Amino acid sequence: MADVSTSMRLKLPVVCFILEIILIILFGALVQYDYETDAKEWHNQSHNDYENDFYFRYPSFQDVHVMIFIGFGFLMTFLQKYGFGSVGFNFLIAAFSLQWATLMQGFFHGMHGGKIHVGVESMINADFCTGSVLISFGAVLGKTSPIQLLTMAMFEVTLFAVNEFILLSLLGTRDAGGSMTIHTFGAYFGLMVTRILYRPHLDKSKHRNSSVYHSDLFAMIGTIYLWMFWPSFNSAITAHGDDQHRTALNTYYSLAACTLATYGMSAVTSHDGKLDMVHIQNAALAGGVAVGTAGEMMLTPFGSMIVGFLAGIISVLGFKFLSPILESKLKIQDTCGVHNLHGMPGVLGAIVGAVTAALATMDVYGKGMEDVFPAVADGSIDASKQGGVQALSLAITLGIALLGGLIVVFGTPPDTLCFEDGVYWEVPESEAPHEAQLTTVRTEETEKLSS
Amino acid sequence: MADVSTSMRLKLPVVCFILEIILIILFGALVQYDYETDAKEWHNQSHNDYENDFYFRYPSFQDVHVMIFIGFGFLMTFLQKYGFGSVGFNFLIAAFSLQWATLMQGFFHGMHGGKIHVGVESMINADFCTGSVLISFGAVLGKTSPIQLLTMAMFEVTLFAVNEFILLSLLGTRDAGGSMTIHTFGAYFGLMVTRILYRPHLDKSKHRNSSVYHSDLFAMIGTIYLWMFWPSFNSAITAHGDDQHRTALNTYYSLAACTLATYGMSAVTSHDGKLDMVHIQNAALAGGVAVGTAGEMMLTPFGSMIVGFLAGIISVLGFKFLSPILESKLKIQDTCGVHNLHGMPGVLGAIVGAVTAALATMDVYGKGMEDVFPAVADGSIDASKQGGVQALSLAITLGIALLGGLIVVFGTPPDTLCFEDGVYWEVPESEAPHEAQLTTVRTEETEKLSS
Amino acid sequence: MADVSTSMRLKLPVVCFILEIILIILFGALVQYDYETDAKEWHNQSHNDYENDFYFRYPSFQDVHVMIFIGFGFLMTFLQKYGFGSVGFNFLIAAFSLQWATLMQGFFHGMHGGKIHVGVESMINADFCTGSVLISFGAVLGKTSPIQLLTMAMFEVTLFAVNEFILLSLLGTRDAGGSMTIHTFGAYFGLMVTRILYRPHLDKSKHRNSSVYHSDLFAMIGTIYLWMFWPSFNSAITAHGDDQHRTALNTYYSLAACTLATYGMSAVTSHDGKLDMVHIQNAALAGGVAVGTAGEMMLTPFGSMIVGFLAGIISVLGFKFLSPILESKLKIQDTCGVHNLHGMPGVLGAIVGAVTAALATMDVYGKGMEDVFPAVADGSIDASKQGGVQALSLAITLGIALLGGLIVVFGTPPDTLCFEDGVYWEVPESEAPHEAQLTTVRTEETEKLSS
């Protein structure tokens, strides 16, 4: 592994081509249009075109799609010299993950007569699973090669589908916006991976692990898109009608309350009482994570705002006090602070969901109970039992995520060349790191590695 | 007020927390899901899911949401050293305003049995009201603290709701896209505030009150999003069916015509015949403002294009000739030129609306008259009277906006530190203003203030 | 033409105003609301509001709109000193083209009783035609004045409408996403224009014909938006129901497969095995172009992925090996490489469409055949004949595009001042090219021109 770039020339194309060819073969063998996308099937029955699920979900799908590719992609461009890697590797692993997720999710809970049926709902679910992988990417940002990222994605998507299957299909857990399945899972999986890949000499790349003025503005593009479209994210696969409507509304208020909490906490904890861009870029989003489970329930705007408010506070405190401890004591180098944005708020969201579920009554939900808690509506379990199932699901998710993160093992770029686009990308000349310097560093590293 | 930042550490958190806690308590006491978001209510009656208002309005809502947070936020990033403040304070006051607006608008015209009902329409209305506050923010950009901005937002939202109540509920004025209620109101309110806060020594910050190459590109993100989604803005709360469709179409053509007028006028008025980014970023949007009232009417594409064309011309002329006079003679320092983008085009839009209303006939509108002019359709007034009501509404809006702007009073950052992120934000080191210099300036200011 | 800017002061306003006034007059004489946007017409019949085409197509329209103004606009900002021109001229010619296209397309295939009917479908079609013009703009980027661009747009829109009329109306060709009508047409038209405008001394502007770090990030905004919303582009005007749904799905998978192929090919062909931003920004989109014709057909996800995979490979190979040859041997200076992104993938898309059409059977399409191949469904031609028509359409498109590009002739900025915003835009002082230097260059050029 004398030269990082030379090995890329061989390995990356091989990995990309082999993965894509496998995907194509499996799609050829297993994937079919579902009832609503198939010309013959759809026209076989009589109904109106506006009943096609496309019109209920496609606008939400596109909002989710923007969150995955622009939201996550640009949120991570805050690093001064890792903008190409942030948005570019995000693009690569997302494009891979959504294909692989279609297969894995289809395999575990979408088979119909030996075939995986696809349509707008499977597209949303694949994007959701991809979101989880991108959360983990945030934890290891700047310290991994694209090949490692693709490997990680392959494992993580698989385990995501397993966890999702256990929760949604076996246990009947409700988690429409994925506080558990997406955020908690992605965060703790990523934290475990970054722990295993601990780099004792990462401080050698410390000067690059920070932002410049314009990179912070690029990151704000990601933040704002995530913030705006989170109501679509949480409501994208809830039941039609009041459910989608209510989930969007709850998320909207949770995020608004979270934002005020974030600004207040940022000023109170920061140096000199100034606002810290890291908090604004991340903690203001915690409100969306924290109503991912309970958003479809009758949480009320009041309840949503309380949850969002708490999520903002917890998240800023995490950035200020917990992250340094995680790094120094537990050797967890969490580049984007996903523990503060997705980890803790995800756990909070799971708990809120469990409590809200346990308190559900027919008096509040009426016939709408069938949409939100079908098992409670048909009398097979009672509400408090549903709450217990929700709580159990959190534990299972944490277990699978942490164990799953342990599985992934591999080789990585030297500590001196982290957070640096020049390793994997052609960088415009004027801004490229001094070639000589780069070479020197490489040589040193090579010596170390080969010694 | 010796040190701006120290006072932020105390005041901003206190203000944020108190405001949010008050909001949460009021939401708990007053706010309820409406018929279409409530699980029990919606399921109590028989209807198809696609009849839920969510599917008629949510895509438009998301477009409006993008205009508020990305559109306004990035439009103002043109300042070279105030990008964090532009997008960051925009974020803060918008998140506050939309919550406060839900309460105020609900209080004035959304109470049902002592409760404020919320759903996608209230979300759009709250975003609309927020837009008005952000217009005013444009007038004072770079010269106010976040606490002042929150105070301004609190007053402005309240008065916005009062004005809206008088127009829409008492008088039966039509103003779906808010030429009067949003743009005229926001602009003249903001101009009055910036007049009261007149800074005689603002030329000390003159070198920062300008753009750099990349800040102009960031601002174009805001411009283009506002331009693209304006058809959704104007049509978001018009009646279902032909009304939403027609409004979007009219706005689309008005904006296209406005853009050509803007480029032509920019070249003719600018130094050396070159195009001026300030014009492109702002005047090209005036066409959307100017069909805010008449867009839902049978204005025809032809009429819409004439209105857009005029709006573009007026707006560029305003930037070139009127803004300097307003500053030098009337002491109105309008940072973003909101008078040219929202003020004059808003007044034009109100006049166009009044004339178009006065000319409405059953021959043109048919049974569609019920949607656009219900009072004319049921015979309680005739079209010319509706035109009169529209004109009166403009006068009322101007009066309330200007008087309202007078109410807001407070203390502000020193003239030497305007348009500077370093006052309120942690700025990445390499780009921070020289610490010594900042300190010196502060000390001087402190001396002045305490003397 | 002694001074470029002086002539702009006169010519650009005159051109903009005359064009817009002509447009307004023609709209006044010819354009009418269609059935679904007209208050009287829509209310004359009984139907539900959700049957209005607005709800089937407006969200797709807005996605297409974003692709046209943000997608194309920002994709071209990769040039270090031509960001204003990229996004600003894109804005100008798009705003003109969509109005002119409404007239031309209406004239050729939208007349009803002597009037052109407009609604959401005409808006989408106008945006599509605009897209074609912007593709041609990509070929000549940085080397043409705004007046030339408007002239080119005027001719190109007209010929686009002629070609579209021949294909869709006369021959019954299927091309919902425009592999032929939009991409192939726009690319070869633009390549012919740039060939005629060949600049032997363009290497004098060579140092500006490249990117800087942040300009590449701005370009990624354009890329990602194009990528995300391409499913909406291809499905925007297909039949309601399964057709829109299926087209979006096929495009989604084609793009994902294309992205992996692009990353692999970029690493294998680039210097040192590093990824090249030019490939990522462009080739990853070829998958959307290549399913523009067959996307609405029963191509299956499997077929879509194969097409996308091939498109990505072809596109990167084009950038690496074909573009340099086109420039050195054929004197085609293709600034954005539109031949690789739109030309070859467009031709591939046409071929895939012809083959897929030829293979269509009732067994696969059932009653859905009426939506996709109405002429095959009603028995007037058989599937293999439809395939032949598709192939013929490609030849016609290539012919009209290449001949059309020959027509456009004009005068242009000097070779030394290409790719430079300072010629047409007020550039913030600190970054403006040294005034003296600019003057010197101008003087030299003037001498040459006048000699």
Swiss-Prot record, chains A, B, C:
The chain crosses the membrane at residues 12-32, 64-84, 88-108, 122-142, 152-172, 177-197, 217-237, 248-270, 275-295, 299-319, 341-361, 391-411. One of its GO terms (cellular component) is cytoplasmic vesicle membrane. It comes from the Eukaryota. One of its GO terms (biological process) is ammonium homeostasis. It is a multi-pass membrane protein. The keyword Repressor does not apply. The gene is rhbg. Residues 1-11, 85-87, 143-151, 198-216, 271-274, 320-340, 412-451 are cytoplasmic. Belongs to the ammonium transporter (TC 2.A.49) family. Rh subfamily. Signal peptide: none annotated. GO terms for molecular function: ammonium channel activity. PANTHER family: AMMONIUM TRANSPORTER (PTHR11730), AMMONIUM TRANSPORTER RH TYPE B (PTHR11730:SF42). Keywords: Ammonia transport, Cell membrane, Cytoplasmic vesicle, Glycoprotein, Membrane, Transmembrane, Transmembrane helix, Transport. Functions as an ammonia transporter. May play a role in the elimination of ammonia in the gill. Pfam families: Ammonium_transp. Disulfide bonds: none annotated. Residues 33-63, 109-121, 173-176, 238-247, 296-298, 362-390 are extracellular. This is Ammonium transporter Rh type B. Glycans are attached at N44. It is found in: Basolateral cell membrane; Cytoplasmic vesicle membrane.
